[in-house]
Regions:
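Hydrolases whose catalytic domains are alpha/beta-hydrolase-1, hotdog thioesterase
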Residues: 16-17
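Conserved N-terminal helical subregion
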Residues: 2-5, 22, 49-118
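Active-site loop of classical SDR/Rossmann-like NAD(P)-dependent oxidoreductases
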Residues: 44-48
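Glycine-rich FAD pyrophosphate-binding loop
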Residues: 20-42
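A detector of helix-start/N-cap boundary segments at the beginnings of structured domains
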Residues: 41-43, 98-99
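Short, solvent-exposed loop/turn segments at secondary-structure junctions
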Residues: 12-13, 36-37, 53
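Beta1/beta-strand and adjacent pyrophosphate-binding region of the FAD-binding site
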Residues: 1-13
Length: 118
């Protein structure tokens, strides 16, 4: 008997969960969101470490349009007086198939949403 799963919230976590349920189980699921539509406003940036990318690649994140993501090589840290404190070389944490990634939250949400229905 198939289990029925309710996922509350169509944010990054809820849509990621839905993608993994779809890929690895035969359970039925429904994603519930209190808003009438998903907010795909531009402007909110997120950062995903290499380990996050490895997980997302299991649901084909590696096939996302490369023009929509950025793979910085370093991160600079500044104090409140805008003085550089240090930098972090990200290349030593990257692998060929999983790199530190920045992108707009809307790009990730759109990918996760579309991936559920393909």
């Amino acid at each position: 008997m198939k289990k029925k799963i309710a996922i509350i919230g169509a944010g990054v976590a809820g849509l990621t969960l839905a993608n993994f349920i779809k890929k690895y189980t035969d359970h039925e699921f429904m994603v519930y969101e209190r808003e009438e539509s998903l907010s795909l406003e531009e402007g909110y940036g997120i950062q995903l470490g290499a380990n996050s990318i490895k997980i997302l690649n299991e649901i084909n994140f590696n096939k996302i349009n490369n023009e929509k993501v950025f793979h910085p090589s370093t991160i600079d840290f500044y104090n409140i007086q805008n003085e550089k404190i240090c930098d972090l070389n990200l290349s030593k944490y990257n692998s060929i198939d999983a790199k530190y990634t920045t992108l707009q939250r809307s790009t990730l949400i759109e990918f996760l949403k579309e991936n559920i229905y393909t």
